[in-house]
Amino acid sequence: MSPVATESMYKPTTINQTAHQQAMDPLKSKQQSNATVNKPAFKPEPAVNLTPIKFAPIKEHQVQRAMVRRYFQDMEERAISDVIIVGAGSAGLSCAYALGTARPDLKITILESNVAPGGGCWLGGQLMSAMVCRKPADEFLDQVGVPYEDEGNFVVVKHAALFTSTVLSKVLAMPNVKMFNATACEDLIIKPCPINPGVQRIAGCVTNWTLVSLNHDHQSCMDPSTITAPLVCSFAGHDGPFGAFCVKRVASAGLSEGLGDMRPLDMERAEDHIANKTREILPGLIVGGMELSEFDGSARMGPTFGAMLLSGKRAAEVALQSLDRVKIEEGEVVGLAK
C-alpha cells in the first residue's frame, strides 16, 4: 500500500536542513556537490627567480645513529651529575640559568616530564599572553635579556613565551647543561648522610621516560634508571601527574612531617614567602617555586611570576653554598670540605 502523501513531503529543503544532511553524510554530500557544482580551477601564479632547493643525500640509518649516539652519550655522561634540576618551568629554568652562568664547570642536568619544557610559563593567567613580574624580578629579566614594559611596581613582558623561549635557548646553549625532557623523576635516591649520623640524604634521582612512568599500572617490570648527584633542586610545581613530586616522596618516605598543602591565593604573601623561603629542606634537596607552597602550606600567587624567577635564582645561590660545604667523590657526598 502506497504511503499517504502529506504536505511536509512537498516542502522545499531549507539551508539548515541541507547543512544537517551534509553533516550526517559528508561523503554523499561531497559526491553530490561535485556532480552539480562547477568549481573554477585555481591557477597559481608561477614562481619567479626561486632557486631550487636540493638537500644533501642521507640514509635513514644515519639519522637514527646520530640521534641514538648523542642521546645515550648524554645519559652515560650524566649518570653522575653535580646538580639535578627537576622541572623546567619558570623557576627551574631560572635556577639553571643562574647556576650555569655562575659555575660553568658544574654538570647541570635538567629533568622535565613534559615533551615541551616551560611549565606554566608559556602563557599568563587564564590562557592570556602577557606575563606580569613584580619588582625586583625585573633585574633578572635584564640579566637574561627579556624586554618588558614598566608599570611602576611591576613590569609586563608582552608574551610569557618571550621569557620562556629566551631563557630556555640560553640555558640549552650552555655546554655544561643537559636537558632530558619527556623524562620523569619517579623516585629519589636516598642514603644515610655521611656527615650527620642518623640523617638521610638525597643522593640523586630515579628516572624513567614519562610515558613509561604513567603506565606502570598497565605493564609490569618497567624498571627505571638513575642519576647520581650530591644535590637535587626541585621545582615540580603544584599540579599535574608529577606535581610537587619530590616533597610528596620525602613525606611518604617519612622524612618530613608531611605536606602543608597550598593555601588559597594571596599574591603579596605568596611571592614573599616563595622567594625568601626557597631552601634546602633536607640534606641534598633544595625546593622552590610552587612545589614549596605545597610543602610549607603557603598561599598561591596566581598569574604573577616574579617569585618564580627569584626563587630559581635563590635556589642557585643556596646550591653553590651547599656544594662548597661538602666533599664529593663520584657524585656522592663523603664528608665535609676541608
From Swiss-Prot:
Annotated binding of substrate, by residue: 91, 112-113, 120, 185, 223, 238, 290, 300-302
2,3-didehydroalanine (Cys) PTM positions: 221
Cofactor(s) needed for function: Fe cation
Pfam families for the chain: Thi4
Record bears the keyword Ribosomal protein: no
EC numbers for this chain: 2.4.2.60
Record-level GO BP terms: thiamine biosynthetic process; thiazole biosynthetic process
Annotated region (Disordered), positions in chain: 1-43
Record InterPro entries: FAD/NAD-bd_sf, Sti35, Thi4_fam
Post-translational modification: During the catalytic reaction, a sulfide is transferred from Cys-221 to a reaction intermediate, generating a dehydroalanine residue.
SUPFAM superfamilies recorded: FAD/NAD(P)-binding domain
Superkingdom of the organism of origin: Eukaryota
Cofactor binding remark: Binds 1 Fe cation per subunit.
Keyword terms: Cytoplasm, Iron, Metal-binding, NAD, Nucleus, Thiamine biosynthesis, Transferase
Record bears the keyword Acetylation: no
Function text: Involved in biosynthesis of the thiamine precursor thiazole. Catalyzes the conversion of NAD and glycine to adenosine diphosphate 5-(2-hydroxyethyl)-4-methylthiazole-2-carboxylic acid (ADT), an adenylated thiazole intermediate. The reaction includes an iron-dependent sulfide transfer from a conserved cysteine residue of the protein to a thiazole intermediate. The enzyme can only undergo a single turnover, which suggests it is a suicide enzyme. May have additional roles in adaptation to various stress conditions and in DNA damage tolerance.
Matches recorded under HAMAP family: THI4 (MF_03158)
Protein family membership: Belongs to the THI4 family.
Subunit structure: Homooctamer.
Protein name per UniProt: Thiamine thiazole synthase
Native organism: Uromyces fabae (Rust fungus)
